[in-house]
Amino acid sequence: GYHDWQYPKEEIDKLRDPSVKAVCVINPSNPPSYELAPSVLDQLVDVVKKDNPEMMVITDDVYGTFIKGFRSLMYVLPYNTICLYSFSKYFGATGWRLAAMALPEKNIFDDKIQRLPEAEKADLHRRYSSVVLDPDKMKFIDRLVADSRLVALNHTAGLSTPQQIQMSLFAGFGQIGRASCRE
């Protein structure tokens, strides 16, 4: 039969259950690059707003740059969503594992950390006290960066590999306006 690469309504409705804590969505799909239909995005918004406002959404938007007018879950559900993006597809650097993560200033991840039991907050305080002066106010995204640096330091430090330098150039390119490219 015909495959439209959309999540069936009954599958999305399963996310209404508050015991579902997180969902990971690949949008556009990998590898055919079909984006979620507006009706599917609307249903996901409805699920979060009406039935499961505590659900964390992880969206992988790697193929988003190939879709004209692409709308990310980060756009329609910013508070609940963390967005993953890879430079590798757009710039043809597959296999290099060059990626970025985005999170809005006000987000569910920071709020969930603030609502943790005191014992868990104390563990986090100890874990990040060597990184910042006030670990209790440390943002979730900064915790991810700190943790990823620990991993990176076990491999290589700084901008020492071609991939790390290339990722910096890709990120810089994304900041250049279209008018600047024509000059």
Predicted regions and their residues:
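PLP-dependent class I/II
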Residues: G1-R182
